[in-house]
């Protein structure tokens, strides 16, 4: 599909079925089409993806989208292909035959938007496949991964400036929902987004349809009671977040004992299992998933009616990112933090393990 010279709003209607833009979407799109860099910091559910997808459709050339998660890029590519847009992804989940077919599509120009992780740039066969193409746009999704101050730091994200040079220094747009002032500065500096007429677009953090509450609890039994109550009350999908896999598994056993069906997602599962759980959740109409923070970045499912934190999140950025899964359809959704002061010990131990004192080093040295 090629819609060069089309007005952004016409592309919006033809390809995505909407008649008007939200927030500053059109301003951002026109800024990028004017060959200017951009950093977009805006709440989840506001449609940040359109800010690079529409320029990618309008521009002549190939748009490269860097995304941190394999499952996320698959969801976005599937959605674009359903709308008739020539998009693809290349990642480690593909077999050699499929991967070579997509490299061929890059070389012959039949692919308009390609999604990859930053680690893909280590592969010479990928960079060679791009070598003959005009790169019209580089989009960096979940851009907070660039910064060591960010809650999801990924080392290869810090090399994106090198990768951009390989691509011929195309116009770049970076997007995130969670970036403190320090993280914003890091993103701008690392990607040189202040060059020329680069601009930051900030949409605040307010999500008025999300109802936030904190419930003080004194035991796992009280936590279980709350989770069961929310599951029975709300029609729609829900996520319950846990810090520790062991606690997640304990609650899974308790919920099974109460006849409540659910999925489990955490970093201890094999990649194939994690992908299967995510696909089941994305297809479900009333599905509950118990998860650690390994689940969630980029999850784009409209009808998540509640997000419950069964214990205290590791950071305010993680909390905001995780509750941002809820209510993307604009309908009211409940976000509850179950506060038990004993849970603070878990994070205090994390801090201690990550910042050992001199006595600890001495003990290790003498072993």
Outline where the language-model segments fall.
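Helicase motor core with emphasis on the C-terminal RecA-like subdomain
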Residues: 6, 10-15, 19-23, 27-46, ...
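Basic/polar N-terminal segments that are highly enriched at the extreme N-terminus
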Residues: 1-3
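Walker A/P-loop
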Residues: 49
């Amino acid at each position: 599909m090629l819609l060069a010279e089309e007005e952004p709003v016409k592309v919006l209607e033809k390809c995505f079925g909407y008649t008007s833009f939200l927030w500053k979407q059109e301003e951002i799109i026109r800024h990028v089409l004017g060959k200017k860099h951009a950093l977009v910091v805006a709440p989840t559910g506001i449609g940040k993806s359109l800010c690079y997808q529409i320029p990618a459709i309008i521009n002549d050339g190939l748009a490269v989208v860097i995304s941190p998660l394999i499952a996320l890029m698959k969801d976005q590519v599937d959605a674009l292909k359903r709308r008739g847009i020539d998009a693809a992804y290349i990642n480690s989940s593909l077999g050699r035959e499929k991967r070579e077919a997509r490299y061929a599509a890059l070389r012959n120009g039949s692919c308009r938007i390609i999604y990859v992780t930053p680690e893909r740039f280590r592969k010479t066969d990928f960079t060679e496949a791009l070598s003959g193409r005009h790169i019209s746009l580089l989009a960096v999704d979940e851009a907070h991964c660039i910064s060591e101050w960010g809650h999801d730091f990924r080392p290869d994200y810090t090399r994106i400036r090198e990768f951009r040079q390989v691509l011929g220094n195309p116009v770049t747009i970076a997007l995130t929902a969670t970036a403190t002032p320090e993280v914003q500065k890091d993103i701008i500096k690392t990607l040189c987004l202040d060059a020329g007429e680069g601009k930051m677009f900030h949409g605040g953090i307010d999500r008025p349809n999300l109802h936030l509450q904190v419930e003080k609890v004194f035991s796992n039994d009280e936590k279980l009671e709350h989770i069961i109550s929310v599951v029975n009350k709300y029609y729609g999908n829900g996520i319950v977040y846990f810090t520790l896999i062991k606690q997640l598994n304990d609650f899974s056993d308790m919920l099974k004992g109460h006849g409540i069906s659910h999925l489990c997602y955490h970093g201890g599962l094999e990649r194939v299992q994690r992908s299967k759980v995510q696909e089941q959740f994305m297809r479900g109409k009333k599905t509950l998933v118990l998860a650690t923070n390994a689940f969630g970045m980029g999850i784009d499912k409209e009808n998540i009616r509640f997000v419950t934190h069964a214990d205290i999140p590791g950071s305010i950025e993680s909390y905001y990112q995780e509750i941002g899964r809820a209510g993307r359809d604009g309908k009211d959704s409940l976000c509850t933090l179950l506060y038990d002061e004993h849970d603070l010990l878990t994070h205090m131990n994390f801090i201690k393990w990550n910042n050992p004192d001199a006595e600890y080093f001495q003990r290790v040295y003498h072993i």
